[in-house]
UniProtKB/Swiss-Prot annotation:
Residue intervals on the Cytoplasmic side: 1-15, 381-392, 450-461, 518-627, 690-692
Designated name of the protein: Vacuolar membrane protease
Keyword Ligase annotated: no
Cofactor binding comment, as recorded: Binds 2 Zn(2+) ions per subunit.
C-alpha cells in the first residue's frame, strides 16, 4: 500500500512533479541540441577502419591547403594558378582511365555572350548582357549504362577578393576531387560530369557557361556543393522536389542534415545570396544544393580561411556528397513525385520527408475532422451531464494572458529597436530567451492572479482545449499559404505536427468527459444538498489559486478514501464567483461548503458520494484523475517543444547575421524571433501556471539576465564582428582622387573606426558619412592612391582606362533619321579582367540600345576584326558586363547599336542641338588583387594601401569584404 501511495504521489498533478518534468524535458532538449551540433566532429574516418575514406579526407585537406593559400578571385592572377593546380590534379586522378575524359574551357577558348537577369536580385528590371570567357574544367566519367540520365557534380573554384575561399567554395572543390577519385575506382552505372567552374561570385557565370558545352546534354541531375557561410555542417539547402528529397533520405544514412525551412527562407529571399544551383534549376535540372550556411559575418571575409574551419566540416560535406553521388550513380531513381518537399533531420540520425502537397491534404483532413470530433464529444458530454459549465472569465483567461504576453513582448521589442537593434548578430540566444521567458512569466502572473480572485475548476483542460482552437486557426492560415504558394512554403510543417499532438490531447480530455458516468453529477448535487458542510480527514487543504490536483498527505488516507476524493475530479461544475469561494480543480468542490463537521461519516462503509458507483468505476476514474495529465503533457510538450525550438534555432542560426545587411533584414529577424518565441511557449502555457515558486523564480531571473544581455551588451565582438564593405573609386571624369567607400550598418559604428586610422587622424582628411537606403551608412574619404601596376616611372592613374571611339554615325548625313545608330568602342585597360558598360539616354525613359557586338580580336582598326558574338534585345539593354581571361590582352572591342528617339516614341520635334539621340556610356573597370605587391621605381609597394590600413588598424570587432566585384574601381564616361 505504501508503494502504491508513493507511486501515486510521484505521478500526481502537483507543482513539484510538473516543475521536475519540465526540467527533465528541457534538459533532454538541451542535450539533444548539443549532441546534434557536436556529433559530426567525432565521426572522422579512421585509417584502420576506413582506409579509403581516410585517404580521401587527408588528400582533400591537403588540396584545400594549397587552393586557399591566397585570395583567388576571377579578377586575379592567383585564379589562374588555382585553375592550373586543379587541372593538374584532375589529370593525375583520371590518369589513363578508359572511361574518363577531360575538357578545359581555357584551352578551348570557350566564351559566351548572353542576356542575363540579375541572379542576385530577381526584382531588378535592369537589362543586362554578359560576355564571359570561361576557364571551367570538366571531367566526364562514362557510365556502364550510358542510357541512364547523367549526374552533374559542380563547385566553383574562384573566391571573392577579400576571402581565401576555404568554405566558399574550396571545400566544395576538393570534395569534387575526392568524389572523382572515388568514382574512378568504382565506375558508376550512369555517366557523371564534374564541373570545376569559375566566376560564380559575380554572376554565376561558370554554371551558365556549362550549358554552352555539349556534355550538358548528358546530365539531368545535379549535386551542387557551395558555401554561403564559413564552416560547421553542410546542409541540404535546397532540393528540387519530393523525389529528390527521398533520394537524399535513402542515400545519406550517416549524419544527414537538412531542413526545408532553409529552402523556404532562401526562395523567400531572406538570405541575400545565390548559388550555381539556381542556374542549373532554371535550365531544367533536378538535384541537391548542399552548402555551408553559417556564420554569415565571416562569409566573404579574410576569416573564410583554413584556420577558421576544420577537417570535421570538410568531412561532413565530402561524405554527404559521396554518399549521395554513389547512390545516384549506381541506382535506378524513382522521380515521379515532383511536388515540393517538406523535410528535416532528427539530430543527424534520421531524415524525414513528406510531400508538401500531401502535407496540405493531411492539414485539410485535420482541419475538417478534429472540430467535428471535438464538437461531437462535447455534445455527448453535455447530454450525459459530465461537462462542466464554466463562466466567461474561465474561458477567457488563457487567451487573454497569451494576448497580454504578446503585447508586453511587442513593447520589449520596441526597446530593442531603440537601444540595441543589432543584438541578434552577437548572440540570438539572449533575445529569444528574453521573449520566451517574458511570455510564459506574463501568462503565469495573469492566470494565477485571475485564479486567486475568480478560481477556475479545470484550468488545465480549458487551456488545452483553447490551445487546440488557437492552433486550428493557425493551421487554417498556414494551409492557405501552402496552397496559394503552389506548395512552396515548405517550412510550415512544424505547425502541423504541433496541431496534431495538441488535438489528440484535447480530444482525450473530451473523450474522458464523454465517457464519464452521468450519475456522478447527480450524486454530486445530492451530496451538496444533504451534506453542505461535508468534510473528512481524507480531504486535504484546497489551494487558493484554484490549481488542478491536491498534494495529499498519503498517510492520512485509506484506499477507499483516496478513491472517493478522486471520484469528484472534473465532474462537478463549480466555478466560483469570488475569492471567498476557493475551488479545487481536481475535486470541483466549493471549499466553503466543506467545513469540518462531526456529522461527516468517518467509516469506510458510511453513506458518501461514492454511493451507487462500483469499485471498478472508482478505480478507473482515479487512474484518469491522477495520471491523465502526464499523457497530455507528453503529447503537448516534449515533441512540439523540441521541433519548435529546433525550427527557431534553424531560422536564427541562418539569419541572425543578416541584420548587418539592412533594416529590413533586422525587422525580419526580430519578427522571426518574436513569433518563434511565442510558438515555443505555446506547448507549456496550459501547464505553466502550476509550476512551483522555484521554477517561476528561475524564469524571472532568466528573463532579467536575458533582457539585460539583449539591451545592454555591444552587438559586435572579435568572434562576431560587424561586416563592412569596401571599395576604392577613381572617377577619371572628375579627377584622379582615390575615394574610399566604406558601407555598413547605421549606428555610429563606421565613423569612429575610420577616425582612428593613421592616414586620417594625422591629416585633415574629411570623412563624409551619409545614410543610404535600407538602414545602411556610406562613409567616404580620400584614401591613399592604389598601386595597381608595376612601373619604372610615376603611375598615372588616368592611363589605367582609356576609351577610344572607333566609329559613330549618329551625326552622319548618310544615316537615315529612321535608321539605328551604330558605334564602335575600344576600351584600353591594363592588367584587367572585368569591366562594365552602362548605357543611358537623357531623352528616353528606357535604354535605346538594341544590339551589342563583342569582337574577338581587339585591334585598333575595325577592318582587322572578326565578329564573334552578337546579341539583340527588343526591350533594350542597360548594361554590358565584360569578363576576359588574358591579362596581357589590354583591350575590349565593342559594337553598340541603338535606336534614335524618333523610332522609340515617333516624335518628330526638332533637334536643333543634335543631342536627343545621344547615348551616355559609363565605364567601370575592376581590380581585385590586394594581398600582393607592385614594383614602383624598384621598390615593392602594396597594391591597395588604403585597404591594408583598414585591415591593420580597425578593431577586431570589424571584418571587411568587397562592395563590388573588385576592390578598386576606375570609372570614366563618354557620350556617343
Amino acid at each position: 500500500m505504501k508503494l502504491k501511495s508513493v507511486f501515486r504521489s510521484v505521478l500526481k498533478y502537483r507543482k513539484t512533479n510538473l516543475s521536475l518534468l519540465l526540467l527533465i524535458t528541457y534538459s533532454i532538449i538541451t542535450l539533444l541540441y548539443i549532441f546534434d551540433h557536436e556529433r559530426y566532429k567525432l565521426n572522422l574516418p579512421k585509417e584502420d577502419e576506413h582506409p579509403e575514406f581516410n585517404d580521401l579526407l587527408e588528400t582533400a585537406w591537403g588540396d584545400l591547403q594549397i587552393i586557399t593559400a591566397s585570395f583567388h578571385p576571377y579578377t586575379s592572377k592567383e585564379n589562374d594558378k588555382v585553375h592550373d593546380y586543379l587541372l593538374k590534379r584532375v589529370l593525375e586522378i583520371t590518369g589513363n582511365s578508359s572511361f574518363a575524359s577531360v575538357s578545359d574551357d581555357k584551352e578551348s577558348e570557350r566564351s559566351i555572350l548572353f542576356q542575363q537577369q540579375d541572379p542576385f536580385n530577381e526584382s531588378s528590371r535592369f537589362s543586362r548582357v554578359t560576355y564571359f570567357e570561361s576557364s571551367n574544367i570538366l571531367v566526364k566519367l562514362e557510365g556502364k549504362n550510358p542510357e541512364e540520365e547523367g549526374l552533374l557534380l559542380s563547385a566553383h573554384f574562384d573566391s571573392v577578393p577579400t576571402g581565401y575561399g576555404a568554405t566558399d567554395d574550396g571545400m566544395g572543390v576538393v570534395s569534387l576531387l575526392a568524389n572523382l577519385k572515388y568514382h574512378i575506382k568504382h565506375r558508376p552505372n550512369r555517366t557523371l560530369i564534374f564541373n570545376f567552374n569559375n566566376n560564380e561570385e559575380f554572376g554565376l557565370l561558370g554554371a551558365s557557361t556549362y550549358f554552352n558545352h555539349s556534355w550538358s546534354n548528358l546530365t539531368k541531375y545535379v549535386i551542387n556543393l557551395e558555401g554561403t557561410g564559413a564552416g560547421g555542417k553542410a546542409v541540404l539547402f535546397r532540393t528540387s522536389d519530393t523525389s529528390t528529397a527521398k533520394i537524399y533520405q535513402q542515400s545519406v544514412k550517416e549524419n544527414p542534415f537538412g531542413n526545408s525551412i532553409y529552402q523556404q527562407g532562401f526562395y523567400s529571399r531572406y538570405v541575400r545570396s545565390e548559388t550555381d544551383y539556381k542556374i542549373y534549376e532554371e535550365n531544367g535540372m533536378r538535384g541537391w544544393d548542399v552548402a555551408f550556411y553559417k556564420p554569415r559575418n565571416l562569409y566573404h571575409t579574410i576569416k573564410d580561411s583554413i584556420q577558421y574551419t576544420s577537417k570535421a566540416s570538410l568531412w561532413h560535406m565530402l561524405h554527404t556528397s559521396l554518399q549521395l553521388s554513389a547512390y545516384v550513380a549506381s541506382n535506378s531513381l524513382d522521380t515521379a513525385d515532383q511536388t515540393p518537399a517538406c523535410y528535416f533531420d532528427f539530430i543527424g540520425l534520421k531524415f524525414f520527408v513528406i510531400s508538401a502537397k500531401t502535407l496540405f491534404y493531411w492539414n485539410c483532413i485535420f482541419l475538417l475532422v478534429s472540430p467535428v470530433v471535438a464538437i461531437g464529444l462535447y455534445l455527448i458530454s453535455r447530454d450525459r451531464m459530465t461537462w462542466k459549465s464554466h463562466s466567461w472569465l474561465s474561458w477567457t483567461r488563457f487567451p487573454l494572458s497569451l494576448a497580454a504576453g504578446i503585447i508586453v513582448q511587442k513593447l520589449f521589442s520596441n526597446d530593442i529597436i531603440r537601444s540595441n537593434p543589432l543584438t541578434f548578430s552577437r548572440n540570438y540566444f539572449w533575445p529569444i530567451s528574453a521573449f520566451f521567458t517574458q511570455v510564459i512569466f506574463t501568462s503565469y502572473v495573469l492566470i494565477n492572479c485571475s485564479n486567486f480572485f475568480f478560481p477556475c475548476a479545470d484550468m488545465k483542460s480549458l487551456s488545452i482545449i483553447e490551445l487546440f482552437i488557437i492552433l486550428w486557426t493557425i493551421l487554417l492560415f498556414t494551409s492557405k499559404l501552402l496552397y496559394s504558394s503552389d506548395y512552396r512554403y515548405t517550412g510550415l510543417y512544424p505547425l502541423s505536427i504541433f496541431f496534431l499532438l495538441s488535438t489528440i490531447a484535447a480530444i482525450l480530455r473530451l473523450l474522458a468527459l464523454a465517457l464519464g458516468m452521468r450519475t456522478r453529477k447527480r450524486l454530486g448535487r445530492e451530496c451538496r444538498d444533504h451534506h453542505s458542510n461535508y468534510s473528512s480527514h481524507s480531504q486535504i487543504d484546497m489551494e487558493r489559486d484554484g490549481q488542478e490536483n491536491l498534494e495529499q498527505p498519503q498517510d492520512q488516507f485509506t484506499s477507499s478514501q483516496d478513491d472517493q476524493a478522486s471520484i469528484q475530479d472534473d465532474n462537478v461544475s463549480t466555478t466560483s464567483a469570488g475569492p471567498s469561494h476557493n475551488v479545487d480543480e481536481d475535486h470541483g468542490m466549493d471549499s466553503s461548503s466543506q467545513q469540518h463537521d462531526e456529522r461527516v461519516p468517518l467509516l469506510k462503509g458510511s453513506n458518501s458520494m461514492e454511493e451507487g458507483l462500483s469499485t471498478r468505476e472508482n478505480s478507473l476514474k482515479l487512474e484518469y484523475t491522477d495520471y491523465a495529465w502526464i499523457i497530455q503533457f507528453l503529447l503537448i510538450v516534449p515533441i512540439p517543444s523540441f521541433i519548435l525550438f529546433n525550427s527557431v534555432d534553424v531560422i536564427m542560426d541562418a539569419l541572425n547575421h543578416t541584420v548587418q545587411e539592412g533594416s529590413k533584414a533586422t525587422f525580419d529577424v526580430l519578427r522571426f524571433g518574436m513569433v518563434g518565441s511565442i510558438l515555443m511557449a505555446l506547448p507549456i502555457l496550459p501547464f505553466f501556471y502550476k509550476v512551483n515558486y522555484i521554477t517561476i523564480s528561475l524564469t524571472a531571473l532568466l528573463f532579467l539576465i536575458s533582457a539585460s544581455k539583449t539591451l545592454l551588451v555591444h552587438p559586435f565582438t572579435n568572434s562576431n564582428p560587424l561586416k563592412v564593405r569596401f571599395s576604392q573609386n577613381i572617377d577619371l571624369s572628375q579627377g584622379n582622387a582615390a575615394s574610399v567607400h566604406v558601407l555598413g550598418r547605421e549606428g555610429n559604428f563606421l565613423k569612429p573606426m575610420l577616425q582612428d586610422l593613421p592616414s586620417i587622424k594625422y591629416s585633415s582628411t574629411h570623412i563624409n558619412c551619409t545614410s543610404v537606403t535600407n538602414g545602411m551608412e556610406l562613409c567616404m574619404y580620400d584614401g591613399m592612391q592604389p598601386n595597381l601596376l608595376s612601373t619604372n616611372g610615376n603611375t598615372n592613374i588616368s592611363s589605367m582606362v582609356k576609351v577610344h571611339v572607333l566609329h559613330n554615325n549618329r551625326n552622319s548625313t548618310e544615316r537615315s533619321p529612321y535608321e539605328p545608330i551604330v558605334a564602335e568602342l575600344l576600351l584600353e585597360v591594363k592588367e584587367n579582367r572585368a569591366c562594365t558598360l552602362t548605357f543611358e539616354s537623357r531623352h528616353q525613359a528606357k535604354s535605346p540600345v538594341r544590339e551589342i557586338t563583342v569582337y574577338q580580336k581587339k585591334n585598333s582598326a575595325p577592318q582587322k576584326t572578326n565578329i564573334t558574338k552578337t546579341i539583340k534585345s527588343a526591350s533594350g539593354i542597360n548594361e554590358l558586363q565584360l569578363h576576359k581571361l588574358d591579362f596581357d590582352q589590354e583591350t575590349y572591342h565593342i559594337g553598340v547599336q541603338w535606336f534614335p528617339k524618333l523610332l522609340t516614341d515617333g516624335n518628330l520635334e526638332d533637334d536643333k542641338l543634335g543631342t536627343k539621340d545621344e547615348l551616355s556610356v559609363s565605364i567601370s573597370c575592376y581590380w581585385g588583387e590586394y594581398d600582393s605587391e607592385s614594383v614602383v621605381n624598384g621598390t615593392a609597394v602594396r597594391k591597395i594601401p588604403a585597404f591594408d590600413e583598414l585591415i591593420n588598424y580597425a578593431p577586431l570587432s570589424f571584418s571587411f569584404t568587397n562592395e563590388q566585384k573588385g576592390l578598386v574601381i576606375v570609372k570614366d564616361a563618354i557620350i556617343l
